[in-house]
């Protein structure tokens, strides 16, 4: 289709009107497929973003499990669950290691119900999932609720799908700002088949 225009000097010229919709059938099919893929990608990205936001920020209330009730000193393990059971499995493996070395271990999830008075604990362990290099909000909020760590030795465990070590730094600074003593840290990947054994050995290496 053409449109005609008259210039200031009364000259007539025509310009082909561009059409966004292709005329050939195969081009129409290709365009439809591309548009459909874009819509699916945007929808998936939005859904994944909502899921990720929920996993990072959600708090899960749970009972306090006690391992080795007759241990010499008491250690508290607080962890934030993730999409998979990996943070849970790592936390319990570490707690098992502590119990095997003589600790009485209390383990629970990061929530408003988790102990915030650390006066009876000689060791605190904070474990959390890492998504996009971000520390889980629930574990950060839990640390915020502790007004004074009273110098308690603190272990930080980052659980991710890759290198999650960088996420430890801001949480370490947060603990130290609240009068906590940074003791050690672990960055474990769920792609490592020996991750749980590494967590267990790390726990067993800490004596009461």
Where do the protein language model's features map onto the residues?
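Polybasic, lysine-rich low-complexity intrinsically disordered segments
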Residues: 3-4
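FMN-binding flavodoxin-like domain, especially the glycine-rich phosphate-binding loop
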Residues: 10-108, 117-128, 132-208
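Short acidic active-site motifs
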Residues: 112-114
């Amino acid at each position: 289709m053409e449109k005609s225009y008259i210039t200031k000097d009364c000259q007539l010229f025509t310009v082909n009107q561009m059409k966004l919709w292709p005329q050939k059938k195969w081009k129409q099919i290709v365009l439809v497929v591309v548009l459909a893929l874009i819509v699916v990608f945007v929808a998936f990205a939005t859904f994944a973003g909502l899921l990720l936001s929920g996993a990072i920020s959600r708090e899960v209330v749970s009972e306090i499990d006690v391992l080795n009730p007759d241990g010499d000193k008491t250690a508290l393990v607080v962890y934030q669950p993730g999409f998979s059971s990996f943070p849970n499995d790592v936390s319990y493996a570490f707690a098992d290691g502590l119990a095997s070395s003589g600790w009485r271990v209390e383990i629970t999830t990061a929530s408003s119900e988790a102990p915030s008075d650390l006066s009876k604990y000689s060791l605190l362990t904070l474990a959390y999932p890492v998504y996009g290099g971000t520390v889980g909000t629930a574990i950060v909020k839990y640390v915020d609720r502790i007004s004074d760590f009273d110098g308690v030795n603190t272990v930080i465990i980052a659980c991710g799908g890759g290198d999650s070590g960088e996420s430890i730094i801001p949480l370490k600074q947060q603990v130290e700002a609240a009068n906590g003593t940074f003791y050690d840290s672990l960055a474990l990947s769920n792609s490592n088949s020996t991750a749980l054994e590494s967590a267990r050995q790390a726990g067993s290496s800490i004596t009461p």
